Every structure is written in C-alpha cells, then in structure tokens.
UniProtKB/Swiss-Prot annotation:
Region (5 X approximate repeat CLE) residue spans: 136-231
Region entry 5 X approximate repeat A, spans: 127-219
Chain segments carrying region Required for secretion from the host cytoplasm to the host apoplasm: 21-83
UniProt repeat feature CLE-, residue ranges: 136-147, 157-168, 178-189, 199-210, 220-231
Molecular function, one GO term: receptor serine/threonine kinase binding
Top-rank lineage group of the source organism: Eukaryota
Protein name (database record): CLAVATA3/ESR (CLE)-related protein 4B-1
PANTHER family: PROTEIN CLAVATA 3
Basic and acidic residues bias: start-end ranges: 125-137, 144-221
Tissue distribution of the protein: Highly expressed exclusively within the dorsal esophageal gland cell during syncytium formation in host plants.
Signal peptide: 1-21
Length: 231
C-alpha cells in the first residue's frame, strides 16, 4: 500500500509540472488558449491513471496476489469458523409408530389423546348416572322403577287425596271420620257407649242392651207409674 501511494503522488507531481509547463507555452500562442489548458489536463490525467493501473497490475502479478491478500486478512473476524456451514440437523424418523409398541397400542394411545384434547368421553362413562343427574333430566323426579322405596310424604305429593289405603291399612278413628262424614264404621268399632247410642237414636238407648232400668226411669217411661208385674 505504501509503494502504491508513493507512485500515485509521484505521478500527480509530474502531471502538475507538465500542466504548468504547457500553460507557459500557451501564453506564447494565444490562438489555442481556449482549448489548450483543459485538453492537456485531461490527457495528462488519463495517462497518469493508465500508468498507475499498469503498475498496480505488475505488482500484483509479481507478489502472487499479495495486494489483495492483506485486505482479506484484515477483514477476517476473531472467530476462525465464520465461514463454516452450520451443523446438520437431526432427521426425524419416517416411522409412524415406535418399534417398541404394536400398532394396536399406538392406536389406543392416539384415541386417548384425542378424547383428552377434544373433551369426548366413552359410552361407559355416561352410563354411570346418579339420582341427582336423573332429577335434573326429568323435572317430575326420578323414575319409580329405579327408586321403589317411596315414603308416605312422597305418596301424598303424588296423590292429593292422600296415600293409598292398600299400602297403609292401619287407619285410625280420626282418619275414618275424615273419610266418612257420619262417623266411623260400627263394624270396626263395636264397643259403643250409651252416649253414642243416644246420639244415634234420639228416643234413647235400646232397652235390650240396658234391661236393668230403675224405678225413676220407669216413671219417665209410663206416666201412670211403674208396672206392678216388675215391681
């Protein structure tokens, strides 16, 4: 590089000297003054460039490319592997499934992954429904076939009049009064008292049931007095 710059400076100095020498001669010949200066300067510049290019080419051939070798060395980075290609990437295997697992196991695993990602479940998962789920599905309540143990309260809600007497045969006197307005059935309650007979028969109790009558009762029954046969 130093030799090239020195040669260029030398050539420029020669060109300038020639230019000034031609200017002095041009003053002596005024008819060529308009075109002499610029034309001569242009010719000198082209000659200088041609000489510098020839000198540079000769030095390059003589030094075996030493001119450009220095530039290349100066452009090198600290990393010596800057032009090295990247390492080859690991190629994936073209097998659909691993050799350790059979195709059936691979398909089963694939189905499980698919159901987990999509949120789908098998039919066996949906068959296990609880009573709470049945209530939500059917607004009236669960199916009586599945739940046969019904209580008295549930039967009252199902039948407004009350539970079925076949299921609940032990009825009390109060329940019979509500069912029959006239009162309970005398067949169920045979032990009737005198007060109950008075309510049933306005004239009084039956003398067959109460044969032991007193003298006061006979007076009320017969105004003339008691029967002398009995007394």
């Amino acid at each position: 590089m130093a030799t090239n710059t020195m040669l260029c400076l030398l050539i420029l100095s020669v060109v300038l000297a020639l230019a000034f020498a031609t200017n002095k001669k041009g003053d002596e010949e005024p008819e060529n003054h308009s075109t002499g200066i610029f034309g001569k300067v242009g010719r000198v510049v082209t000659v200088a460039l041609a000489m510098s290019s020839r000198l540079g080419g000769a030095d390059a051939t003589r030094g075996g490319g030493a001119v450009y070798g220095g530039n290349l060395k100066s452009n090198l980075l600290p990393n010596n592997n800057w032009m090295a290609p990247p390492p080859p990437m690991a190629m994936r295997s073209a097998k659909v499934y691993d050799s350790k697992h059979s195709p059936a196991e691979y398909l089963k695993k694939f189905a499980q992954d698919f159901r987990r990602k999509t949120g789908m479940h098998s039919q066996r998962h949906h068959e296990e429904t609880t009573l709470e789920q049945e209530k939500r599905v059917a607004g009236a309540g669960p199916d009586p076939i599945h739940h046969q143990d019904t209580t008295l309260e549930q039967e009252k809600r199902a039948v407004p009049a009350g539970p079925d007497p076949k299921h609940h045969e032990e009825t009390t006197l109060e329940q019979e009064k509500r069912a029959v307005p006239a009162g309970p059935d005398p067949k169920h309650h045979e032990e009737t008292t005198l007060e109950q007979e008075k309510r049933a028969v306005p004239a009084g109790p039956d003398p067959k049931h109460h044969e032991e009558t007193t003298f006061e009762q006979e007076k009320r029954g017969a105004p003339a007095g008691p029967d002398p046969i009995h007394h």
